[in-house]
């Protein structure tokens, strides 16, 4: 009888614990799904309120600009692959500031973020898309984050893709990224040395657009890191 009572109590507490966990997870809003330039955008309902009508219009115009520049330079097949990678747009999410890609749910749960952000490009603060400093420094930030998503979800073996990893290791060993020019005129260590993920995303910016670290553009990438240039030509297609 005592065992049955203990078991019943344990079951009750287990159910309560599960209910509390579900309630905690449900504190996050349900996004409203929109389409923009062929991409699925999961939008914070607050951004769509009438009081934010002007902000929403400006933000969507800016985001469309980012996506159009990807559409207009890449082959159609690559565009379609990228359009399968969703974007999550917050009005203003205080805990995070930088635009980022969320590859796994463990970090999201551990830091009490919405686990549904997993496998999304995340724009935590809509106004960042309108920031002049952001445009001056990082005009291809959305491409950068989508490159992370593509690396993770599309390339063979994801972030452990052998070709990218080998190119990164070779570039790191060569030391040619240790001191490079930053967009501001300073000489710094290239952000791409952080890991193979940042190396791929940073070099993709240079190959398809403009990066904030040297090599800034495609011709410079070909001169500075021909191996990665050739790999990106194979991955993204030749840009003429």
Regions found by a protein language model. Give the residues of each.
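Metalloprotease/metallohydrolase-associated module, dominated by Zn2+-dependent proteases
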Residues: 115, 132, 166-240
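Acidic/His-rich structured neighborhood in mature extracellular/periplasmic domains
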Residues: 58-169
